[in-house]
Amino acid sequence: IADPGYKYNVFEYQRDFLNSYESIKQKGCLPVLCGGTGMYLESVLKGYKLMPVPENQELRNRLANHSLEELTEMLSQYKVLHNSTDVDTVKRAIRAIEIEEYYAAHPVPEREFPELNGLIIGVDIDRELRREKITHRLKQRLDEGMVDEVRRLIEQGITPDDLIYYGLEYKYLTLYVIGKL
């Protein structure tokens, strides 16, 4: 879907889903949406009205010296904070404020969104069993060369910050590879 280092976002996920959905429906087939984070799935299933938001370097510079607590307070002035990932780092909090500022100046245009009568199937798994499965999968990925994969990606020019963006596995392996863990 995207090259390593590219920060694929929920807007693009929704757009790509809609394009694929229409293509599959035109062929007379049943589309199946499988996987993704809760927010990404909800963006499709609930028809979130989204639009691409460009970076605002001037705003980022103004916010750069604020603490996470200050940024969280600023963000709470825009909206009710229901998504804690918006404020788990300074970088994410600044991006969330940047998005809210953009939406305030550029209302989201009405967009046709297909009505989806989705059948939602989820796995309700015991917490300990889930942890065991995650641990097993992580050990398997390590045995299959994930540390070398991270080294190769860095050698190919992917920045450590970009790798850390991809989640916990890459975060801690990247910190290990660059000697910060």
Regions found by a protein language model. Give the residues of each.
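Phosphate/pyrophosphate-binding catalytic cores of soluble transferases and nucleic-acid-acting enzymes
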Residues: 1-181
